């Protein structure tokens, strides 16, 4: 039986590579040939299930393909699976990813069917994304990935997983299947060959989670997180990896913080989003901001996310309050800056006792300060009412949230690095200005705006931890 399994499995793969691939390549192109082979490899998992389930051979089979693909990568043995534009390690990554999940399934039996779901997402979903994207002309998202390929990945993954669900004994609902399929498409955008890992490991973990712990709360949290990814990524407000992190945070705030946690996080985000739209309309001459990056999302939401998870695990209300303060402080600081730039008057630096140019850290405007006060007051009031805090505790939340804006201002003025442009003479926080390297002016050289935001968030979160330690 084992010998027959090897003969059938290897024979099928060699048929794809040496017969089907060259035939398709002759009548179409190399990319179509590559991805048809890629998609056809779904049957390898099916054959492993028939011949090698729960034996070490389920690992040996993909290991063989690691060796063969590595040799092909080095010596260009399989013309039907190597790109015309040069060798890429994607075929090796494919085999390594499948080996990893099959190895995990060998040692932990409950991971067996998640390994199959991962294999189907990688073969059908990733394969369809490339085939459709390569042969259609639609908007590019990132790294050459297109909207049509993205939608094709969702559809192909969903259909293949519905078939998988019907054939194999896996207890996942249709909504759960759709969540895994959409998540696979989101992770496929990683690109550069690394999508072989992201799609495989992501769908592997999600399917294991949903098979064992599916609940309405989990489905709602994951569904909402995916919607937020679409909003922030497709609007260009946050870059790809920042959007992925935002997605994780949204899920954590709902799953561990409940409805209040989710509504609180979403209200802060959409307020900033709305202010950005209004600012663009009222002051179109202002320079367009770049998409927020992963590090900025981590700084603004990392501590808040950590404490909301601790709240969900421990049930201690103080953890939720600290999370609200951590998120609220970063939100109000951003709100103050975004609203403040609408002021026609120059911001005032209270530490240096002089006016500074708009956009330079350390400056405060009346308009921005008023926005910070209003935002902090609303957070304090809503938190006190929703969590049934005392009036004194609500005032402490208000004070801590607003205090972060002041701490950020002081640090921005005192320690954030600033430069002088040799061309126009203006003070800037960028190392280059007017196309020339800027000269160091003041501050600590390695402390930029991200450092200032992180330090102010840590200080306020630590203060909240001390103040509410007995709550």
Where are these regions (language model features)?
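Hydrophobic alpha-helical transmembrane segments
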Residues: 1-79, 91-336, 340-471
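Viral RNA-dependent RNA polymerase
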Residues: 79-87
């Amino acid at each position: 039986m084992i010998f027959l399994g090897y003969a059938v499995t290897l024979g099928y793969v060699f048929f794809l590579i040496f017969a089907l691939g060259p035939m398709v390549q002759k009548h179409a192109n190399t990319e179509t040939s590559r991805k048809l082979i890629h998609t056809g490899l779904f049957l390898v998992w099916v054959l492993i299930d028939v011949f090698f389930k729960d034996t070490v051979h389920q690992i040996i089979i993909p290991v063989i393909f690691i060796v063969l693909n590595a040799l092909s990568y080095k010596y260009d043995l399989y013309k039907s699976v190597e790109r015309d534009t040069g060798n890429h390690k994607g075929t090796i990554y494919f085999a390594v990813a499948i080996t990893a999940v099959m190895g995990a399934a060998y040692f932990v039996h409950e991971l067996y069917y998640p390994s199959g779901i991962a294999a189907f997402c990688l073969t059908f979903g990733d394969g369809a994304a490339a085939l459709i994207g390569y042969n259609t002309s639609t908007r590019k998202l990132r790294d050459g990935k297109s909207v049509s390929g993205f939608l094709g990945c969702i559809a192909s993954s969903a259909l293949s997983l519905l078939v998988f669900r019907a054939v194999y004994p896996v207890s996942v609902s249709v909504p759960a299947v759709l969540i895994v399929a959409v998540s696979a498409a989101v992770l496929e955008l990683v690109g550069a060959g690394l999508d072989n890992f992201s799609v495989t490991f992501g769908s592997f973990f999600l399917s294991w989670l949903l098979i064992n712990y599916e609940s309405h709360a989990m489905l709602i949290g994951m569904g909402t997180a995916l919607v937020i990814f679409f909003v922030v990524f497709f609007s260009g407000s946050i870059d790809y990896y920042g959007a992925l992190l935002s997605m994780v945070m949204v899920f954590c705030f709902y799953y561990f913080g409940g409805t209040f946690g989710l509504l609180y996080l979403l209200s802060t985000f959409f307020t900033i989003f709305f202010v950005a739209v209004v600012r663009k309309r009222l002051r179109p001459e202002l320079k367009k901001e770049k998409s927020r990056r992963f590090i900025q999302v981590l700084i603004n939401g990392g501590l808040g996310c950590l404490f909301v998870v601790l709240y969900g695990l421990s049930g201690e209300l103080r953890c939720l309050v600290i999370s609200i303060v951590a998120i609220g402080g970063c939100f109000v600081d951003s709100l103050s800056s975004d609203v403040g730039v609408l002021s026609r008057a120059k911001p005032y630096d209270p530490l240096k006792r002089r006016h500074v140019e708009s956009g330079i850290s350390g400056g405060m405007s009346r308009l921005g300060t008023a926005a910070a006060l209003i935002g902090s007051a609303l957070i304090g009031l809503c938190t006190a009412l929703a969590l049934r805090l005392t009036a004194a505790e609500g005032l402490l939340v208000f004070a801590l949230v607003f205090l972060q804006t002041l701490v950020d201002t002081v640090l921005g003025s005192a320690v954030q690095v600033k430069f002088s442009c040799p061309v126009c003479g203006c003070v800037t926080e960028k190392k280059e200005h007017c196309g020339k390297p800027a000269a160091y002016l003041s501050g600590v050289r390695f402390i930029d705006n991200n450092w200032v935001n992180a330090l102010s968030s840590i200080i306020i979160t630590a203060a909240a931890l001390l103040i509410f330690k007995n709550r």
